[in-house]
Amino acid sequence: MISLQEAAAIVDASLRHAREQGLAPMTVAVLDARGCTVCLKVEDGSSLLRPEIASGKAWSALGMGFGTRNLAFRAASLPSFFGALAALADGRVLPVPGGVLIRSRHGQIR
């Protein structure tokens, strides 16, 4: 499992990178392998739904076992499958880039 300290370091590094790139205000969420939120930070100016979006991207990557950039590509070519998947997951699947799996050096999801 990922620790709070590790999750916070990932969130902080992600936000730092976003600032260096001049991106709009960000929200970053890190979930553990169970899908529970370990750390979530919302930058000033980030819009109302951003926490749900960030968590949805992370949850989708966990649920499918690969990042959401790949998920978005697959959703474009299999819309009926992803419509059914969204229904099965109570609308929580978010097939858009941004969700990344965090793995141990042995390949286990953290």
Predicted ranges, named:
Residues 1-110:
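Flexible, solvent-exposed loop/hinge segments and secondary-structure transition points
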